[in-house]
Structures are given as C-alpha cells and as structure tokens.
Amino acid sequence: QDWLTFQKKHITNTRDVDCDNIMSTNLFHCKDKNTFIYSRPEPVKAICKGIIASKNVLTTSEFYLSDCNVTSRPCKYKLKKSTNKFCVTCENQAPVHFVGVGSC
C-alpha cells in the first residue's frame, strides 16, 4: 500500500462517517473493521517525517478517530467515535499502513 491508498482508506473530512455506504465500496470489500482519521492529510503525513525505512510509529498527539465495525452481514456497520493516539507504518516519510489505536 502507498500514501495515496492510505489516504483513501483512512483519512476523512467528517467525523460522521457513513460506515454502511463507504465500507461496501470496492476499496474495503465489506471488511470487518476500518479506522478513519478525521484530519487533513498533512498532519498525518508529518508523523513520518524523516523516516525512510519501514518503521511503526505512534502519534505523539491524539486525533479524532471513527471506527466502522461490522455488526452483521452483508456490510452492516456500527460507528464508534473516539479520540486517541494511533500507530502507523511509515515508509519514505509517509504512512502506508494503519497498525492500530493506542499503541504499536
């Protein structure tokens, strides 16, 4: 995965993510869970500043997060909002994989 794909999968301009709609798209294929970061792309990319080789990094500050968790098949989800730190895999000074919430 690359930075552009990471942005499409994890960065949003709304806290009220329409989970049922977005998770049914070809980008997600009804996967069990996805976390969205409510932010402009620049602050998220800055997490990886100076990191070239693949490395997991925990944010130093908290972000608004929106989790879409599957509740039933096919493609029915519940939205859970939170504020927390998160961990990403950085490569070539950009996030390429969302590792998890709270810790690496």
Swiss-Prot record:
GO molecular function: endonuclease activity; nucleic acid binding; RNA nuclease activity
InterPro entries referenced in this protein's UniProt entry, alphabetically: RNaseA, RNaseA-like_dom_sf, RNaseA_AS, RNaseA_domain
Signal peptide: none
Keyword Heme: no
Chain positions recorded as substrate binding sites: K31, D32, K33, N34, T35
EC number from the UniProt entry: 3.1.27.-
Homology family: Belongs to the pancreatic ribonuclease family.
Protein name per its UniProtKB record: Protein P-30
Classification lineage: Eukaryota, Metazoa, Chordata, Craniata, Vertebrata
